Amino acid sequence: MRTNPTTSSPVVSTLEEKNLGRIAQIIGPVLDVVFPPGKMPNIYNALVVEGRDTVGQQINVTCEVQQLLGNNRVRAVAMSATDGLMRGMEVIDTGAPLSVPVGGATLGRIFNVLGEPVDNLGPVDTRTTSPIHRSAPAFIQLDTKLSIFETGIKVVDLLAPYRRGGKIGLFGGAGVGKTVLIMELINNIAKAHGGVSVFGGVGERTREGNDLYMEMKESGVINEKNIAESKVALVYGQMNEPPGARMRVGLTALTMAEYFRDVNEQDVLLFIDNIFRFVQAGSEVSALLGRMPSAVGYQPTLSTEMGSLQERITSTKEGSITSIQAVYVPADDLTDPAPATTFAHLDATTVLSRVLAAKGIYPAVDPLDSTSTMLQPRIVGEEHYETAQRVKQTSQRYKELQDIIAILGLDELSEEDRLTVARARKIERFLSQPFFVAEVFTGSPGKYVGLAETIRGFQLILSGELDGLPEQAFYLVGNIDEATAKAMNLEVESKLKK
């Protein structure tokens, strides 16, 4: 789908015929504005409040029209703090939705929801802008061919492979490693595929946003010496922002990604951390707008809001957007309406397990809960499919035997079951992997493991060729050759101790 980005002078030119209203009511981030009869703005139009507060400080607040109330009043949601606003202040209707800069000028820079740079590196070329509200590509423009997107992370590539141009969800509670996994994916994809990425930080910690930026500069994903050669654009609407900004920042990031897909005809990666915060912000705004809450206090328009964002993330004949979204699961409950609604849109799910994280298995991806529509013999091939199924069967059998082991001990198991448990424990450890972005914490260098190497490694474990090796040799290594080398080192160390 071709975008029609506007190539024009700055927004000021659209304000020549100013359509002015006045603030009638302020409730937190929600403003009611009165306009003259016949001059009502459209839904989603951007309104600008300019002036000075009681202390004489300059105010410049952008809002978005959400409701037409009647009696020439509209209700709008502010995209920044409403401190200092007063009733009676003038409001300018810009006559258009929020528009943000797009194209090469966005690479290597950090933006807020309005498309304004917030990294103190000077202004951005805003000659090419695009509105954040657009319809999804028409059915006839979609591209339907299926291909795997290799990530270099063993557990992902083997058991829940990602689809090129698909939508992937990272599910997990607080502190199990969603953001670290996203950072590793950005790192691997920039280095292995040379693709352009757009990162949307939606309602997450400002510290994490800053850490990610520094990490990208260190790893060369953002090129400080020549910003234009950077591989990623960052859009942040963090926890401290009003709900309006957190609700729309995902659309700002998506608009930038769509331009790379439709006009530059590139394959783009869109990271959203965290899609739950998008729903949460929508819930806050919905309550402020006076809508009746739905299940568990969520907004009644939850499915519609999610659909309007997710349906724009797709592959067209021009290019693709592959989206990887972190999904916070409230109280680890996958049946909560927010994660449950997200599930419906995904091609693959990577579920992070607190039990594995507690064991020190990182990435803590649950091999049994994680799924992918791509894991079919006709797509990935018989060898990959068979290996993945056998890994899952072995892990499932180990899970079933854990109660018996806890009560009676390993000795009460049959010979066959003991062998299954030993292999399952090796598989569990071999599914861990040292990350490039976690080198600082783990002290071991990161590893990128190709799909062929991953399949070979698990086939060797399942065949029984490596039954003699200790299970700790498989922990936090790259390919299977490193595991055998580590086993030899462990043997040498144990002999020296004796």
Swiss-Prot record:
Q: Which Pfam families match?
A: ATP-synt_ab (PF00006), ATP-synt_ab_N (PF02874), ATP-synt_VA_C (PF22919)
Q: What's the Enzyme Commission number for this chain?
A: 7.1.2.2
Would you say which domain of life the source belongs to?
A: Eukaryota
The biological process GO terms on file are: proton motive force-driven mitochondrial ATP synthesis
- How the protein sits in the membrane? Peripheral membrane protein
Which cell locations does it reside in? Plastid, Chloroplast thylakoid membrane
**Could you tell me which SUPFAM superfamilies the record lists for this protein?**
C-terminal domain of alpha and beta subunits of F1 ATP synthase (SSF47917), N-terminal domain of alpha and beta subunits of F1 ATP synthase (SSF50615), P-loop containing nucleoside triphosphate hydrolases (SSF52540)
What's a single GO MF annotation on this record?
Answer: ATP hydrolysis activity
Gene Ontology cellular-component annotations: chloroplast thylakoid membrane; mitochondrion; proton-transporting ATP synthase complex
What are the alphabetically sorted keywords of the record?
ATP synthesis, ATP-binding, CF(1), Chloroplast, Hydrogen ion transport, Ion transport, Membrane, Nucleotide-binding, Plastid, Thylakoid, Translocase, Transport
Q: What class of enzyme is it?
A: translocase
| Nucleotide-binding among keywords | yes
The record's subunit annotation is: F-type ATPases have 2 components, CF(1) - the catalytic core - and CF(0) - the membrane proton channel. CF(1) has five subunits: alpha(3), beta(3), gamma(1), delta(1), epsilon(1). CF(0) has four main subunits: a(1), b(1), b'(1) and c(9-12).
NCBIfam families annotated for this entry?
A: atpD
This chain belongs to the protein called ATP synthase subunit beta, chloroplastic
Q: Which organism is it from?
A: Salacca zalacca (Snake palm)
